[in-house]
Structure formats: structure tokens, C-alpha cells
UniProtKB/Swiss-Prot annotation:
Top-level taxon: Eukaryota
Pfam families the UniProt entry points to: F-box
Limits of the F-box domain: 17-63
The protein's name: Putative F-box protein At4g05620
Disulfide bonds: none
PANTHER family cross-referenced by the UniProt entry: F-BOX/KELCH-REPEAT PROTEIN SKIP4, GALACTOSE OXIDASE_KELCH REPEAT SUPERFAMILY PROTEIN
CDD domains xref list: F-box_AtAFR-like
């Protein structure tokens, strides 16, 4: 949303107003806890608030209390035309019936990359919301 601001009789300048979430923090955490981890990488692009919440131990604790635990496997792939490897989450859809042999119940979902250099990735482990 933008609001006009007039300055000395000239054309009005447009000042952008920051949008903020109107939901209380606890409600937002509860809502995100009900969303599948498959969608977290997309949600992290929406707002900075989502990025920090998705990476927070608080969200994973809430998911655990709600019984919304999802197993996933992190996969690191290096493509020939890219200088750095890319991270994906192997998401296994539970309770899916495969209609034919061409379809697959599993998805590789892109995951935001780790900020350290690939040389330090000799051994990594994911615990809750963190990758070490």
C-alpha cells in the first residue's frame, strides 16, 4: 500500500508502507505447524518473518506437540554446469497409491543453501530445524 506525500507544491511523492502480519505470533506458529514441510521452501520466500519461523526450533516443537512429524532426507547434488552443489529435501508422500509405474510418490524439493563453503560440508546432520 502506498500513501501520497506532498512536498512544496510539486507532484506528490509516493512512500511505500511496510506490510506487517496482523496475526499474533503464537497463531502464526500454530498455522505454519499445520503446513507440510514440503511447502516450507516456498513459504520462506513470502516474508522474512516466515523464513525465521520456519527455521525456528519453536515451530518444530509445536509440530511435535501436534503430532505433525514428517520424516525427510536431505540430498546434496552437484550439477555439471553449476559451481556449487544444491540442496534438496526428499519428501516421501505417505498413503499415496501409485496409479501407474510412471508416477512416483517421492519429490525432490529445493532447500535454501547453507551459507558455508562446500569444503566444510564433509559431514552434515539435520537435527530438528537445523543442519550441522
Amino acid at each position: 500500500m502506498a500513501s501520497p506525500v506532498t512536498t512544496n507544491g510539486k507532484e506528490p511523492l509516493v512512500r511505500k508502507q511496510k506490510k506487517s502480519l496482523s496475526l499474533p505470533h503464537d497463531v502464526l506458529v500454530s498455522c505454519l505447524a499445520h503446513v507440510s514441510r514440503l511447502h516450507y521452501s516456498i513459504l520462506s520466500l513470502v516474508l522474512k518473518n516466515f523464513r525465521s519461523l520456519i527455521a525456528s526450533p519453536e515451530l518444530y516443537k509445536t509440530r511435535s506437540l501436534l503430532g505433525r512429524i514428517e520424516s525427510c532426507l536431505y540430498v546434496c547434488l552437484r550439477f555439471p554446469n553449476e559451481s556449487h552443489p544444491r540442496w534438496f529435501t526428499l519428501y516421501m508422500k505417505p498413503n499415496q497409491i501409485v496409479a501407474n509405474n510412471k508416477s512416483n510418490c517421492n519429490l525432490l524439493v529445493p532447500t535454501p543453501t547453507i551459507s558455508s563453503s562446500p569444503a566444510h560440508w564433509l559431514c552434515l546432520i539435520a537435527v530438528g530445524s537445523r543442519i550441522y
